[in-house]
From Swiss-Prot:
Description of how the protein assembles with itself and partners: Homohexameric ring arranged as a trimer of dimers.
UniProt xrefs under NCBIfam families: RNasePH
Name listed for the protein in its UniProt record: Ribonuclease PH
Entry-linked Gene3D superfamilies: GHMP Kinase, N-terminal domain
Any one biological process term the GO annotation gives: tRNA processing
Alphabetically ordered keywords of this record: Nucleotidyltransferase, RNA-binding, rRNA processing, Transferase, tRNA processing, tRNA-binding
Substrates-to-products reaction catalysed: tRNA(n+1) + phosphate = tRNA(n) + a ribonucleoside 5'-diphosphate
């Protein structure tokens, strides 16, 4: 039994609140245990220079932690005059994860900006950001579709993310900060609804881990990703992205 009382294969409680802010085309507050992230999706009717005239869209992400999202105050990155390596890595991960879910040709020459602001951090902020941002992305794309229906609906499949790791001798799902801080192995896994992998980030913090342990962790991650996708479906009130558009 873990310190939180959860079983090793149990995720934290998930709450997804849509339309959390007024102005963004997609806006979600996602809470996974004590981790809380505000995710917004904003649409621009233009693309980066390298995509002009291509007929393809683009999705990019920014990630930020509020100063008191952590136990001690974290300095705002704007005051450092640079983005640190961790932040850059995370926002690239979020962008890659969401782009993998979207047909850019079907989207057309538009940019969707994903902004993830961590309000409170207790482990899993990057995976929580991906899971919440996907719901915000669906809401934003559906608003586009309501204004002018797509010939082909751009979002191809559900995407979620979850952390797994080895704490002590136990392989556990959805690590909180207390567990993440002492984990021998820490891994973030991004998956589709069909069980396909988009990204696997794994580190042996206290030494190498075996292929058998890797397979066991990935099996655990698949269970967690499915639960996260079910939370997304519950929030969207649909089992199908097509139903989410109102299309027949």
């Amino acid at each position: 039994m873990r310190s939180s009382g959860r079983k090793k294969e149990q995720i934290r409680p998930v709450k997804i609140t849509r339309n959390f802010t007024k102005y963004a085309e997609g806006s979600v507050l996602i809470e996974v245990g004590d981790t809380k992230v505000l995710c917004t999706a904003s649409i621009e009717e233009k693309v980066p220079p390298f995509l002009k005239g291509s007929g393809e869209g683009w999705i990019t992400a920014e990630y930020n932690m509020l100063p008191r999202s952590t136990q001690s105050r974290k300095q705002r990155e704007i005051n450092k005059l640079k983005i640190d390596g961790r932040t850059m890595e995370i926002q690239r991960l979020i962008g890659r994860a969401l782009r993998s879910a979207v047909d850019m040709k079907a989207l057309g020459e538009k940019t969707i900006w994903i902004d993830c602001d961590v309000l409170q951090a207790d482990g899993g902020t990057r995976t929580t950001s991906i899971t919440g941002s996907f719901v915000a992305l669906v809401d934003a794309v559906n608003k586009l579709h309501q204004k002018k229906p797509f010939n082909v609906y751009p979002i191809r499949h559900f995407v979620s993310a979850v952390s797994v790791g080895i704490v002590g001798e136990e392989k556990v799902l959805d690590l909180c900060y207390e567990e993440d801080h002492v984990a021998k192995v820490d891994m973030n896994v991004v998956m589709t609804e069909e069980g396909e992998f988009i990204e696997i980030q794994g580190t042996g913090e206290a030494g190498p881990f075996s292929r058998k342990e890797l397979d066991e962790l990935l099996n655990l991650a698949e269970k967690g990703a499915k639960q996260m996708i079910q939370a997304q479906k519950d929030a969207l009130k649909t089992d199908s992205l097509w139903i989410g558009t109102g299309r027949e």
